[in-house]
Design a protein with these regions (language model features):
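Charged interaction scaffolds used for protein-protein
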Residues: 1-21, 25, 41, 46-139
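Active-site nucleophilic cysteine motif
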Residues: 31-44
Length: 139
């Protein structure tokens, strides 16, 4: 199986077992640890949970952006969403796709005209769609 597809399937499995964090930080320590969808991509692909995921969103985003495998998963999920990826302006004035913002925002906030964000089942479904697409279109 293609590594990206396997990573995405692991993400879906984790959410089905432990849930999804949609709170202010990338991770939440409750009875079980839950992760924001972007942080979960990092945890699955890198095999570690950085302490900053609980305390520092900016540092968390920088870590996730530095992980090629996590970003590949987030791009794959972004590709199967109904909305276009948003762009963020960098320090030098260039506009770049912001996959972390796109995917995390989609999973944690209600769409226009709705009062609730996607359910965990809907999030899992999109992740599995991305996994299927990654496996089908693997080179």
């Amino acid at each position: 199986m293609h590594a990206k597809a396997q990573d995405l399937q692991e993400m879906a499995h984790f959410i089905s077992c432990y849930g999804l964090n949609t709170g202010p930080q990338m991770a939440y320590m409750g009875p079980v640890i839950t992760f924001d969808i972007s942080a979960l991509a990092y945890v699955v692909t890198e095999g570690t949970t950085p302490d900053v995921f609980f305390t520092d969103e900016v540092a968390s985003i920088q870590l996730i952006e530095a992980s090629d495998r996590a970003m590949a998963c987030l791009r794959a999920i972004s590709d199967v969403l109904d909305s276009a990826v948003c762009e963020t302006r960098t320090g030098d004035g260039t506009w770049v796709p912001d996959y972390i913002e796109h995917v995390s925002n989609w999973a944690a906030t209600p769409p226009i005209g709705a009062t609730e964000p996607p359910t965990e089942s809907e999030v899992i479904g999109r992740i599995l769609r991305a996994a299927n697409h990654a496996q089908t279109h693997a080179a």
